[in-house]
Amino acid sequence: MMYIVFIMSVLYVVGFIGFSSKPSPVYGGMSLVVSGGLGCGIIMGSGGSFLGLVVFLVYLGGMMVVFGYTIAMATEEYPETWGSNVVVLGAFLVGLLMEVFMIMWLFSGEHELVGFYFGGLEDLMVLGEGGFEYVREDYSGGASLYSYGFWFLAMAGWMLFVSIFIAIEVTRKRY
């Protein structure tokens, strides 16, 4: 399972490299949707299927509306792909090479594979304690999402609300 999550992580970053290399909005939106789906898959692979589902519904459900508006207004007869321009292809390949070198550096054995500190999350550890062996990670994740992560949900909802108005303003006809 670790290798599947690792492969999804690599594809997740490749999707964002594809978006940041500035292709046509059609392909940029597609790479963001693929990266969002892979991010939800990473969360589900790590044991948080409820949180993965919530992120999938909030991110992909809300942003598909925005992508639909922007793609409808930015349609081109000949959209620019990653291989149609030397600069765009070069930016994509440089980003891909940087990721490959980072992976090689992480697996060289000199550094930890995960160098992040997750201190302060001891309150969420309910599976290893005596009387709570039957509590699934999803339920504690759902409780944490609505208690600790309330501001995350509120901010995500507000950003979706504002992005709809931005999309409507961008697509409004000027007479």
Swiss-Prot record:
Gene Ontology molecular function, alphabetical: NADH dehydrogenase (ubiquinone) activity
Transmembrane helix found in the keyword field: yes
One biological process term in Gene Ontology: mitochondrial electron transport, NADH to ubiquinone
Segments passing through the bilayer: 1-21, 25-45, 51-71, 87-107, 112-132, 148-168
Membrane topology: Multi-pass membrane protein
Organism domain of life: Eukaryota
Gene Ontology terms: cellular component: mitochondrial inner membrane
Predominant location category: mitochondrion
Family of the protein in this entry: Belongs to the complex I subunit 6 family.
Function: Core subunit of the mitochondrial membrane respiratory chain NADH dehydrogenase (Complex I) which catalyzes electron transfer from NADH through the respiratory chain, using ubiquinone as an electron acceptor. Essential for the catalytic activity and assembly of complex I.
Self-association and partners: Core subunit of respiratory chain NADH dehydrogenase (Complex I) which is composed of 45 different subunits.
Protein name, as recorded: NADH-ubiquinone oxidoreductase chain 6
